[in-house]
């Protein structure tokens, strides 16, 4: 690359005069000023080139000139009277202040002198009324143009100069700095070998992969993994977001793709990383493009051409891209020869969460009571970024409380903040509402502990959290769930209905607190019918397509079944909800006294642990000589 080249935004490079906004504004201002002065005068353009002089006289002298016929014409304004003399080319303009005089016009008529009226203009009013708005609009236009020029790396006529905005970095991240994605790391380890020893593979006739697509949910470490590959291989790392290629002008995105690959080739071996590639790689068959000249489509076509065009045998350039929406990418982008491999960077399992917590806990001063395995059990389903945030939040909590070490209680509080939201201690609720919340959460807890396939209870609280929750039951599974059996889905429905059922059984009146529970229960049954084939309504037929597994998009937006099928689906959902609701109410009725004890303790302490919930249920069963219905740990969802 030519390091001596100065781009248009180089502070040491001189701008042409006509590109200076202030100079252009001044020029336009002078032109407008001259034009307005000419237009507002009572003389023509021809009179400007004659030799004229102006003389101020009294009104009496003006009348004498008119009476002696020494003026050729008279112009009458609101406050002034102007008269032009008859002295050939050397004319004199006489100006007098007008006074109320009804005899002036008859005098002009009697002397047969031409007269007319003229409007007197105020120069400063003209400036404010005409010149100032024009200059303001012009200034705004020049400001926007200069900003656009900077963003586009040189303006409309300087697309190629965006090269100077593309800088290589040498990441210091290594695979040891990552945890919880061992399978993903194994998939990309050989990419490091390709970059370090390209001749070894070329001598065997092997073709080095041109592209690797990293897919997975948000926050799982896709960007970090790409940097680790470059760090391990010690090669230049060129990173751009997919949206950085798209601009207002068609062709600019394609130009940036060319610039990016040109620079990467000169620095080869190197890595190009495109984050959120779905911004430019959306499928052209999905109806997302406006026309064949759409900016996104041109950018995608250029990317496809570049990945086809560069050779990688001697000087490899490998493209890494990240997305959490692989299902919308263009098939041409995913074919062999472009993105040869897809690597899943998924949420960590229990072991992975422990390792991630260990990585992020290194700079934190810990108390002796910290148990990372317990925290890992409470954080099933969270991504690496969530775990890093929990560690940081725990450190902030300890500092806020003037503690010298981070304790287990700080980590647990940080987990609850991440799952349920910020604790609202200042939110005051009435005793009546507090009672409703206590019964509601107790219902969730009891059904969760007595239903096979549900998650165990870790904590029950009636302290408001987040934007809307007045209480919550924390019952996270110890491990991620990749499959769910039908009885586990039914168990989840029962737990969700436990809150509403408890209100119904103990208070004989229901509230709006169960709205989200009912919505989630309905969605589960809808999925059983339309997607999982777990009902007699549609049998094994899939009625709706799942949208996006990584972003939690739910089920398809378009309905692909008949009105009759829709009616049968609605009937099935309603009947199953009613059936499970009756079952849950009966279970709660059987354990009325246990729930009353739980509610009283919640009123007193506001928080009880999962162990205490199980103790209350066991004590009730022993005192009433009942066979235990508590579900053993191994039969809970884990």
From Swiss-Prot:
GO terms for cellular component: plasma membrane. It is found in: Cell inner membrane. Zn(2+) binds at residues 440, 444, 517. Its cofactor is Zn(2+). ATP binds at residues 216-223. It is an enzyme of class 3 (hydrolase). Keywords: ATP-binding, Cell inner membrane, Cell membrane, Hydrolase, Membrane, Metal-binding, Metalloprotease, Nucleotide-binding, Protease, Transmembrane, Transmembrane helix, Zinc. GO terms for biological process: protein catabolic process; proteolysis. Gene3D superfamilies: 1.10.8.60, 3.30.720.210, P-loop containing nucleotide triphosphate hydrolases, Peptidase M41. Residues 1-15, 144-638 are cytoplasmic. It is a multi-pass membrane protein. The chain crosses the membrane at residues 16-36, 123-143. The active site is at residue 441. One of its GO terms (molecular function) is zinc ion binding. SUPFAM superfamilies: FtsH protease domain-like, P-loop containing nucleoside triphosphate hydrolases. The keyword Transferase does not apply. Residues 37-122 are periplasmic. CDD domains: RecA-like_FtsH. SMART domains: AAA (SM00382). Its EC number is 3.4.24.-. Acts as a processive, ATP-dependent zinc metallopeptidase for both cytoplasmic and membrane proteins. Plays a role in the quality control of integral membrane proteins. NCBIfam families: FtsH_fam. Homohexamer. In the central section; belongs to the AAA ATPase family. This is ATP-dependent zinc metalloprotease FtsH.
